[in-house]
């Protein structure tokens, strides 16, 4: 009887150790998967922001809009690469409006989703109802903008200049639960993105006629100064 009892204790100890290893491995895999999803979501946001486009003459089409809070979103027009998520759906239509939004998930919690629509086209029903899910179990999605017009320049969480691109955007994404701190997100990422473009003004977007070939009659009106030839 004593031997059987000792054997039972040994088996129980082995099982407990094995279960702890399996549970730790599962937790580690879940954490790694969550971190990878967060990196993919952040990279998608960065790629879209660095491809943003804006033309002042078409401000109604190229507006830049954002909102923070429980229904946070970020929407703008970008010229996207072929490797951008879901680009295959749109063929050669690489100039599209992208909207990143924080929405309730079907099961519970919230998720960060991406919708796209080619410029000058309405949103498709499929894109509206079945957006690309970039991240699940999102606790927070916030966006801030560098306001160069403020005195002094500073960060703001409200971008009211919808017909102008911000020069610098900071976004943060928090996901999951920290098992050691109840109520705290398990993963958080912060990125600073410098937009490599500015809003194109009408005079640049639609320049006037050039000087034409040599000997051609010049258009009426003041002419630009010509460089002096060699003396």
Ranges and model annotations:
Residues 1-17:
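N-terminal single-pass transmembrane signal-anchor helix
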Residues 8, 25-28, 56, 149, ...:
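Secondary-structure transition/capping residues
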Residues 13, 17-127:
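Extracytoplasmic beta-strand-rich oligomerization domains located immediately C-terminal to a leader/signal peptide
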Residues 56-91, 126, 133-167, 198, ...:
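Low-complexity, Gly/Pro-rich coil/beta segments used as flexible assembly/activation regions
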Residues 92-97, 128-131, 183-190:
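Short, mixed charged/polar active-site loops
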Residues 135, 142-231:
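Short linear sequence signals and composition-biased patches located at protein termini or domain-edge surfaces
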């Amino acid at each position: 009887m004593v031997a059987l009892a000792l054997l039972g204790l040994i088996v129980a100890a082995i099982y407990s150790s094995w279960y702890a290893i399996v549970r730790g491995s599962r937790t580690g895999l879940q954490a790694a998967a969550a971190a990878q999803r967060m990196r993919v979501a952040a990279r998608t946001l960065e790629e879209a922001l660095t491809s943003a486009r804006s033309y002042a003459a078409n401000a109604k089409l190229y507006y830049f809009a954002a909102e923070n809070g429980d229904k946070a979103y970020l929407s703008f027009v970008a010229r996207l690469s072929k490797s951008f998520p879901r680009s295959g759906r749109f063929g050669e239509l690489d100039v599209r409006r992208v909207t990143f939004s924080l929405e309730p998930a079907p099961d519970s919690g919230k998720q960060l989703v991406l919708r796209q629509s080619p410029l000058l086209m309405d949103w498709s029903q499929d894109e509206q109802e079945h957006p690309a899910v970039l991240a699940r179990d999102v606790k927070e999605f916030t966006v801030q903008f560098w306001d160069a017009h403020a005195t002094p320049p500073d960060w703001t969480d409200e971008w009211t200049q919808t017909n102008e691109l911000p020069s610098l955007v900071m976004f943060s994404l928090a996901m999951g639960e920290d098992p050691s701190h109840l109520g705290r997100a398990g993963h958080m990422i912060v990125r600073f993105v410098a937009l490599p473009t500015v809003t194109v003004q009408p005079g640049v977007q639609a320049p006037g006629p050039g000087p034409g070939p040599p000997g051609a009659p010049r258009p009426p009106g003041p002419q630009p100064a010509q460089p002096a030839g060699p003396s």
